[in-house]
């Protein structure tokens, strides 16, 4: 883009703020003051670099990192429930062993045990519901019926994904994000 609007100024290897700042300081301050916006990840070093070198520029967090953070939070909820299910299953096994019986686990209509449901549910949580297979739809119905907090977290993550996937002007996007945040 030869320095025009929307062009990439530099791609710098590494995230050590001292190295990156030294690299950007090679660009004259007059030119760095003209930069209006910087896209960066959520790391503290990137924010420091942006503040130090491009103090007039607005900082925009890369959508990939925002969505990644939301998905990680969603998976954390699933994993928390999975550990509880594993503990419960281990208790059932220990109790059955004491009694000399075969352990009996709850099996859902799709054939999954609770532990399997939470393990296999991992992949559907990464996808938009429009892209689920029939078995993923069935699994989601059971999973969300059993864990309403997981359903709420999935809905929030999916709504965020949809906002980012729309081709809309900035003011509309900000409004949608504000509604999503409530």
Q: What are the language-model segments listed below?
A:
Residues 2-5, 21-26, 30-56, 64, ...:
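Acidic/histidine-rich catalytic cores and adjacent linkers
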Residues 3-18:
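Glycine-rich phosphate-binding "P-loop"
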Residues 10, 62-64:
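Flexible, active-site-adjacent loop/turn segments at secondary-structure boundaries
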Residues 71-83:
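Short, surface-exposed amphipathic charged segments that create phosphate/polyanion-binding patches used
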């Amino acid at each position: 883009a030869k320095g025009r609007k929307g062009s990439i100024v530099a791609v710098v290897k590494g995230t050590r703020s001292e190295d990156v700042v030294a690299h950007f300081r090679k660009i004259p301050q007059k030119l760095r003051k003209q930069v209006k916006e910087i896209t960066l990840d959520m790391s503290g070093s990137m924010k420091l670099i942006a503040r130090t070198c491009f103090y007039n520029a607005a900082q925009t967090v890369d959508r990939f990192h925002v969505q990644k953070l939301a998905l990680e939070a969603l998976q954390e909820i699933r994993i928390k429930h999975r550990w509880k299910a594993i503990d419960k299953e281990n208790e059932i096994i220990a109790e059955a062993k004491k009694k000399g019986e075969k352990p009996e686990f709850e099996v859902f209509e799709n054939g999954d045990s609770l532990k399997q449901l939470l393990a296999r549910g991992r992949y559907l949580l990464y996808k938009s519901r429009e892209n689920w297979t029939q078995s993923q739809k069935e699994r989601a119905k059971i999973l969300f019926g059993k864990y309403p907090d997981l359903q709420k977290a999935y809905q929030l993550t999916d709504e965020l994904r949809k906002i980012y996937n729309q081709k809309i002007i900035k003011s509309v996007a900000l409004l949608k994000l504000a509604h999503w945040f409530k």
